[in-house]
């Protein structure tokens, strides 16, 4: 017996690649035949390109329009980059699955090699306060300028010498077949990524038990634990993409995880990287407690 499922996604090249990755996984793992229809849309984050994301005045700018197709019954599921999904969603969808996570690391695309090799005063492109803070913490002499656009656009801006370098998520370059553009890759404990980077989240309506059962075969327990723990930290701290905060979790055997939380000043004047191990619940509680102490000390 076959199942029909409509998949909502953003219309960018990377989003379509991510969606096809999910479809292929579902077709491979499902005990039933699955017929899939892709439903494309554009998010506010895709349309508004003249401002940094954190200045758009709302959360989930890459997510809401896609989830709306699900809520309106025009699609059964939506595929998102987990880093784009807010830690608090105020409308009736559930995360039905987190497929196996790919590379969570940040990387540099550069005309001059690594970050340390960039000439004094070089211009690095990013609109992320978190990336800006960590770049300036390492190299306060650099100029960090806003950079929006999809992955192809940002790489092209470096090639055209509009910027000397740019910091991006390595997974996006990998999925686009552009890994050769990477000049340097950063350990997530040294250059802390945002919650959810490298993972996908598949959402559906809260009451859609049929879809939830169908997606059980693509839900990866280890990846879900990592992403949910990262999201729990930012939710408890009440921070989002507008704050220079990064968090990365690596699940170990059983209920054991390692958590890294980075708290920074956007101008690069100060940075604190907290590291801890334990159960997901314990590390969230400890990370939030230590972070609040750091933040209260200024």
From Swiss-Prot:
SUPFAM superfamilies given in the database record:
Periplasmic binding protein-like II, Porphobilinogen deaminase (hydroxymethylbilane synthase), C-terminal domain
- S-(dipyrrolylmethanemethyl)cysteine found at: 241
The record's free-text note on cofactor binding: Binds 1 dipyrromethane group covalently.
Alphabetized, the UniProt keywords read: Porphyrin biosynthesis, Transferase
Q: Which organism is it from?
A: Methanopyrus kandleri (strain AV19 / DSM 6324 / JCM 9639 / NBRC 100938)
GO biological process terms on file: protoporphyrinogen IX biosynthetic process
Please give the family membership noted in the entry: Belongs to the HMBS family.
- Cofactors required: dipyrromethane
The Gene Ontology terms for molecular function here are:
hydroxymethylbilane synthase activity
GO cellular component terms given for this protein: cytoplasm
This chain belongs to the protein called Probable porphobilinogen deaminase
